[in-house]
């Protein structure tokens, strides 16, 4: 059968300088000195329990993983995320494709978050040159360099540019590795095709990022701490640009998934915090934990003493730790993220909170402040 394929080459692509943004980082950023709103007694206890478990994990060199949705970046939480990472409280950060983009836009222009309703109406939502061109190109180059999704973008921000190889070098690489390393050969020919298609010049492509100090990806890259990106096809604005390359996204995202899974392997006595991620976090966690258990069982071990805290705005009156999984006729059963994580063993808790309040309270208590 013949199906129609949308031609992105026909799109009229705007520049970011034409776009109004709702979030201005230096105006809206959350300071480390800012105090969170007060929590209930139960909420305070959960944060104290989480702090206690993080301290144990740090002492035992177990993973402390923080996985979050894009709103954590849009809410200008970078100062807190960077502090948690740089002060050694968190060993792995993970977000979705939108989180990667919002962080990059902040590094590139100091602002992010367009008006979706207005821009869809005028046929312009997500159809912007700079994020579409630079992020996709960073991922294509990163795939050739065998990097992860988040690492590819973090490296571009850190270096404020990309190295574009000679196309003849890429052809040679393709020929050399076609049999011994087909993946490397394929990534090389993909990059060569991109260079030819867009008429890119070999050498250094400068891409200034004047606000990079606010980028979590940049700070993670510089600190050699995993910041993994877990995108889904068609979910993010970079898919509207002709530079977008599915194979490169697949290669880099797979690298990041396997890096994420490697951190889950080290989760015995560790901590997993899922903040504002209803789909991505529980879905990649359950597969990763299953793989990790598979390896541990081969060694005669098992991951049992892990701690999971789920944080989201939705209210839930169900005690997952005490009552187990609710029946199918209870609304809590359809809180997919709670249900999935509850099936993962260990100690699990749910906290209804704004991510700003939770992360601030967590950081302050880790620092010994109230």
Regions found by a protein language model. Name each.
Residues 2-82, 90:
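N-terminal glycine-/serine-/threonine-rich phosphate-binding loop
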Residues 43-48, 208-209, 231, 246-265:
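A general structural motif
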Residues 48-63, 219-223, 262-269, 370:
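Glycine-rich phosphate/diphosphate-binding loops that line cofactor/substrate pockets in enzymes
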Residues 62-71, 93-95, 271-278:
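Short glycine-rich or small-residue beta-strand-to-loop segments that form or flank ligand, phosphate
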Residues 75-77, 82, 86-138, 211:
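Active-site histidine-anchored catalytic micro-motif
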Residues 98-103, 235-238, 281, 315-317:
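Short gly/pro/ser/thr-enriched loop/turn and capping motifs at secondary-structure boundaries
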Residues 115-223, 228-229:
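Ligand-binding beta-strand-loop-alpha-helix segment within the catalytic cores
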Residues 250, 259-263, 269-271, 278-370:
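C-terminal functional extensions of proteins
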């Amino acid at each position: 059968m013949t199906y129609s394929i949308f031609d992105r080459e026909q799109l009229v692509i705007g520049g970011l300088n034409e776009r109004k943004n709702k979030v201005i980082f230096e105006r809206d950023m959350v300071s480390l000195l800012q105090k969170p709103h007060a929590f209930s007694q139960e909420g305070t206890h959960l944060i104290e329990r989480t702090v206690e478990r993080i301290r144990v994990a740090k002492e035992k060199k177990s993973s402390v993983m923080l996985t979050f949705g894009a709103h954590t970046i849009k809410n200008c939480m970078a100062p807190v995320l960077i502090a948690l990472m740089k002060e050694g409280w968190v060993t792995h950060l993970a977000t979705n494709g939108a989180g990667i983009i919002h962080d990059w836009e902040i590094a590139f222009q100091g602002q992010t978050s367009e008006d979706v309703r207005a821009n869809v109406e005028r046929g312009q939502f997500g159809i912007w040159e700079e994020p579409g061109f630079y992020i996709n190109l960073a991922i294509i180059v990163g795939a050739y360099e065998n990097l992860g999704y988040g690492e590819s973008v973090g490296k571009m921000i850190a270096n404020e540019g990309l190295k574009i190889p000679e196309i003849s070098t890429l052809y040679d690489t393709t020929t050399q590795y076609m049999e011994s390393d087909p993946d490397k050969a394929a990534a090389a020919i993909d990059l060569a095709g991109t260079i030819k298609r867009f008429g890119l010049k070999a050498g250094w492509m400068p891409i200034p990022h004047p606000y990079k100090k606010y980028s979590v990806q940049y700070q993670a890259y510089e600190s050699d701490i995993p910041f993994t990106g877990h995108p889904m096809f068609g979910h993010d604005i970079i898919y509207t640009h002709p530079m977008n390359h599915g194979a490169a996204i697949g290669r880099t995202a797979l690298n990041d998934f396997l890096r994420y899974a490697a951190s889950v392997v080290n989760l015995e006595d560790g901590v997993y915090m899922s903040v504002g991620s209803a789909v991505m976090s529980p879905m990649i966690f359950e597969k990763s934990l299953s793989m990790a258990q598979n390896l541990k069982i081969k060694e005669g071990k098992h991951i049992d003493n892990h701690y999971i805290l789920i944080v989201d705005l939705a209210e839930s009156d169900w005690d997952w730790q005490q009552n187990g999984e609710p029946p199918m006729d209870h609304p809590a059963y359809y809180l997919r993220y709670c249900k999935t994580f509850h099936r993962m063993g260990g100690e699990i808790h749910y906290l209804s909170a704004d991510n700003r309040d939770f992360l601030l309270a967590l950081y302050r208590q880790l620092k010994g402040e109230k």
